[in-house]
Every structure is written in C-alpha cells, then in structure tokens.
Amino acid sequence: MSGAGRHILILGGTTEARRLAAELAADPALRVTSSLAGRVAEPRLLPGQVRIGGFGGPEGLARWLREQQVDALIDATHPFAGTISFNAAQAAADVHVPLLAVRRPGWVATEGDHWHDVASLEGAAEALPALGERAFLTTGRMGLAAFAHLEHMWFLVRSVDAPEPPMPPRMETLLDRGPFTVEGERELLRRHAVDVLVTKDSGAAATAAKLVAAREAGVPVLVVRRPPVPQGVPEVAGPAEAVEWVRRLFPRSRPFP
C-alpha cells in the first residue's frame, strides 16, 4: 500500500464506473484510478486519476497491479467489453488482489415486446432480412462489418464516434450519446420509418428507452445476448453495492458520503 491510501483500480468508463469513481474518490483514505479502453475519442471526465489504453493482456495487467501497488480491483466494464473481464480475473488471482465485478442486470422482455435473441452480431445480420428493411442499429460502431454485406437494407446507425469501413452501403449515421428519452426514440423510429431494431443486451437504463418505443410501435427487436464472463468472481449489480464491498474490505476508511 502506498502512502496516499488504499489504491483502487476501476476498469471501465460505464455509468456505473463513473458513479463508483465519484463515490470512492471523495474518501481521502482511498486513491482511485479509472482505466478506459480508449475506444471513445472524447470520453467523459472521471474523478480521481485516469489512464487510457490496454494493459497488454493479463500479464500486463498483473504487472501494473504490482507496480502501482493496487489494493483492490473493480471490473465495471461494459457487458460487451471483450476479454478484459477474463484478463482481470486472471491478473487478480496471479497477484492476490481482491476483485469485484459490477454487472448491471440485463433487460427483460415484457408483454408486447417482440424480441428475437441471437448469440452474435453475425447472427443478428443473418436474421435481419426476414424481420424488416429499415434497421436501427444501436450496437456501436465497432461491429458494423457484420452487416456490410446487406446491400438491400437501409440502416440508421447511432454511435458516439463516427464509424469506419467496412460498413453497410445504405446507411445514415447519427452521432449521439445517451441517456435517451422515450419521446425522442419514438420520434426517431417514426421519422426514419424504422421497422426493425438491433441492440446488444447492455442492460443500461440510459439506453432502454428505445425498447419502450419499439414495443409501442410494434417494431421487432434483435437482441444480441451477452458473452460469457469468468466464473467465481464476486458480483454486484451497481455502484452502491460496490462501495459497500470496499467499505467492508477496508473498514478503517472513513464513512462514505
């Protein structure tokens, strides 16, 4: 442990990660570092220290944990962030650093929803032509290659940063960042005559409005299921529970605000 207090490394720039960083950084007995993947050109500011970029696999992360004298690791990455959760589990085990995963609950279909679960973006692209001709893609700019061969479909693509090829030839891009409102999503579907929605099961409340709008409009939704996560890692559903975990781990820290 360094003289600046217990060092907490938070992986991720999600809403949960930002709220958690703000809560923990308010405690002078803790030193908080947030690590971002660097996939967004202008990420939102985070309290505490921030590092951007990968670690170089589990070995690189383990080395960083040792060199920076990290006392606890919290994985608050996006449910579709790739291999980082597995890297975190291996690195934490290798250097014996306590690890907690913040995993927001997934979305649950309700009466009136017309959802079709698929295992991947490629699966979504395969199922798409049978469901509609004008698709609203909210799966992020990184996965557009899976839909690039669908030349006869039209796509509305919403992402934080501009997408890059390969991507569908008939496409309109909407650069925007949540949270979104049901009223706004309802108008978006109407204005663009969207007849099918494609999304990942991110579970975020900030982007759930599109599902309500789709239900109201009778628009079918292709939902990409979440990838597997490492087994045996303690999990909580949100930042409040993560704060409690840190409080129990380091009971000498002053009460959090």
Label the model's feature ranges.
Residues A76-T77:
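K/E-rich alpha-helical interaction surfaces of small helical-bundle regulatory domains
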Residues M1-A72, G82-F86, A92-V102, V108-E111, ...:
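SAM-dependent methyltransferases
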